[in-house]
């Protein structure tokens, strides 16, 4: 499906902002699919941010020590479904982000079982979670695309050729603190999602994603981006990252080994399914040809269409 409402006239790629209180899916999709990312101001309230920090602050203990993914001045926390239910429910589960993921990375297909035709729909699941605390002296990160874990090799296209399903990942970056060029704000290259996968990133085209606490940046998995150096004397930059992925692909983070079943039960049935504790239509992720929700004793079966 080609994404509609592209700009009527060719416009330069750049960084755009919308207001969470006044925008909608229809307002976001044209900008997101044209530029590759955009800022949603005020997506998360200050009260929710405080709750998230209370849940995650104790886990920020030591810097990254495995080169070259992050700087040693970056403290990284993963496995966030088991550490911050507030982040998962309020950010990953935010209605606006859910709508964006559903529109762009829901998997659709049709097949035959004998003469009978079946149409399958599989909504996205949580793919990855990371909380970042970057301290003064943090080094510049190299440009990368979030979809590389999923072998998503893409050809170059024109902006009006973009179709839902081209990307397999959509990421949400939530500012836990003020983020500036000086304290390490993420850089991204607008329009890079339209380039072929092995195109060499051009840093001269990068822009800084400067945000206030509670602002969020939505980006497509094929968009080049990277963390920047923190050249301040004492500012800490905190950023929370959650990503949706096509449910027919392997999740980047192994959520099933990091989230005990008793904590799974604390989430709503809808969120349990978005975390991946559910079969994917038609039969992905079954246990002895049964819905995992049945085997695990979770409420509400998956919304799948069995074909046998």
From Swiss-Prot:
SUPFAM superfamilies with a match to the protein in the record: Clavaminate synthase-like
Entry function: Dioxygenase; part of the gene cluster that mediates the biosynthesis of penifulvin A, a potent insecticidal sesquiterpene that features a [5.5.5.6]dioxafenestrane ring. The first step of the pathway is performed by the sesquiterpene cyclase peniA that generates the angular triquinane scaffold silphinene via cyclization of the linear farnesyl pyrophosphate (FPP). The cytochrome P450 monooxygenase peniB and the flavin-dependent monooxygenase peniC then catalyze a series of oxidation reactions to transform silphinene into penifulvin A.
Cofactor: Fe cation
Pfam family, one: PhyH
Protein name (database record): Dioxygenase peniF
Organism placement in taxonomy: Eukaryota, Fungi, Dikarya, Ascomycota, Pezizomycotina
Self-association state and partner proteins as the record states: Homodimer.
Gene Ontology terms, MF aspect: dioxygenase activity; metal ion binding
Binding site for Fe cation: 144, 225
A GO biological-process term: biosynthetic process
EC number of this enzyme: 1.14.11.-
Protease among keywords: no
Species, as recorded: Penicillium patulum (Penicillium griseofulvum)
């Amino acid at each position: 499906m080609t994404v509609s409402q592209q700009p009527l006239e060719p416009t330069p790629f750049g960084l755009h902002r919308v207001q969470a209180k006044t925008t909608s899916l229809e307002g976001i999709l044209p900008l997101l699919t044209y530029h590759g990312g955009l800022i949603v101001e005020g997506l998360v309230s200050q009260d929710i941010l405080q709750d998230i920090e209370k849940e995650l602050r104790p886990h920020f203990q030591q810097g990254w020590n495995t080169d070259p993914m992050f700087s040693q001045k970056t403290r990284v926390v993963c496995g966030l479904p088991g550490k911050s239910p507030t982040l998962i429910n309020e950010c990953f589960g935010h209605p606006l982000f859910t709508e964006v993921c559903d529109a762009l990375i829901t998997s659709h297909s049709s097949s035959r079982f004998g003469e009978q035709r079946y149409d399958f729909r599989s909504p996205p699941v949580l793919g990855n979670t990371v909380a970042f605390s970057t301290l003064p002296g943090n080094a510049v990160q190299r440009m990368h695309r979030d979809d590389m874990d999923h072998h998503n090799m893409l050809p170059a296209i024109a902006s009006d050729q973009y179709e839902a399903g081209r990307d397999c990942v959509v990421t949400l970056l939530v500012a836990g603190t003020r983020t500036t060029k000086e304290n390490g704000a993420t850089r991204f290259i607008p329009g890079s999602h339209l380039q072929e996968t092995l195109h060499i990133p051009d840093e001269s085209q990068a822009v800084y994603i400067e945000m206030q606490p509670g602002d969020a940046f939505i980006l497509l998995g094929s968009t080049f981006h990277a963390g920047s150096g923190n050249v301040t004397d004492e500012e800490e930059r905190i950023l929370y990252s959650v990503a949706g992925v096509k449910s027919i692909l392997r999740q980047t983070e192994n959520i099933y080994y990091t989230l005990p079943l008793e904590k799974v039960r604390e989430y709503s049935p809808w969120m349990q399914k978005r975390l991946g504790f559910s079969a994917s239509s038609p039969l992905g992720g079954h246990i002895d040809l049964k819905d995992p929700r049945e085997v695990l004793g979770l409420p509400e079966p998956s919304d799948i269409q069995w074909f046998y």
